A protein has these predicted regions:
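Short, contiguous pre-domain boundary segments
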Residues: 7-13
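Charged/polar, solvent-exposed surface patches and flexible loops
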Residues: 10, 28-35, 158, 173
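Well-ordered alpha-helical segments embedded in enzymatic catalytic cores
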Residues: 25, 29, 167-170
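Soluble metallo-hydrolase cores and metallopeptidase-like ectodomains found primarily
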Residues: 26-80
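Active-site/substrate-binding loop(s) of hydrolase catalytic cores
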Residues: 72-81, 88-204
Length: 204
């Protein structure tokens, strides 16, 4: 393991895969990825009611970090979102590890040959900070996790149409600016009897 690999270990990995980072640790790690590579940029797409930035990472091999430049590049645009329900943190930790591997391992950089990635590690930033060990008691880890709804007690995953939440209003503006070709929304089950560790569903 190289010195850079050690430097870029995620909070989740350092904890022995038992703990997920809080908001401050997550944003700090996002900025570390930005500083460690020219192909990842940290920005935000809005601010939550409690004043937290809504973090966004952009990964592009040719530093196309605007909607206009991505469109001109001809790349497919992939939007990956995690922690719309902050108790379901697997997507956040996996996404940060994926971007880390892309910038630190040459064999992964080919993933960006024809694709630009937008990654939202935490959508519901305020609910994310209501950390507790009993928020999803039937779920297999992490030791503590965030709360399902926002500071205004809104479920963002039920707000795409009515857009009551300031977070969703910011998300819709961001989505319409970027117009991604493919959208992955990461969730975690809290005890349902799925036959596989990872599953996916496609809306058609």
């Amino acid at each position: 393991v190289s010195a850079q690999d050690n430097l870029l270990l995620t909070f989740y990995e350092k904890s022995g895969f038992r703990k997920t980072p809080g908001y401050a640790e997550t944003v700090a790690y996002c900025k570390t990825l930005d500083e460690a590579s020219e192909i990842v940029k940290y920005t935000n797409f809005g601010v939550s009611p409690e004043g937290r930035e809504l973090p966004l990472l952009i990964a592009d091999k040719n530093q196309n970090f605007t909607p206009e430049s991505v469109k001109l590049s001809g790349n497919a645009l992939l939007l990956i979102q995690a922690c719309i329900h902050p108790g379901e943190s697997d997507g956040k930790d996996a996404g940060l590890m994926l971007l880390r591997d892309i910038i630190s391992k040459k064999e992964y950089q080919k993933l960006l040959d024809h694709v630009t990635i937008l990654f939202i590690p935490i959508f519901n930033t305020d609910g994310h900070e209501r950390f507790g060990p009993y928020n999803r008691i039937n779920q297999n880890g992490p030791d503590e996790m965030g709360w399902r709804t926002t500071a205004q007690n809104l479920n963002l995953n039920r707000d795409f149409m009515k857009a009551d939440a300031p977070e969703m209003q910011a998300w819709l503006k961001m989505f319409n600016q970027w117009l991604p070709d493919f959208f992955v929304d990461c969730h975690t089950t809290d005890g349902a009897d799925f036959q596989y560790t990872m599953t996916y569903a496609l809306e058609t």
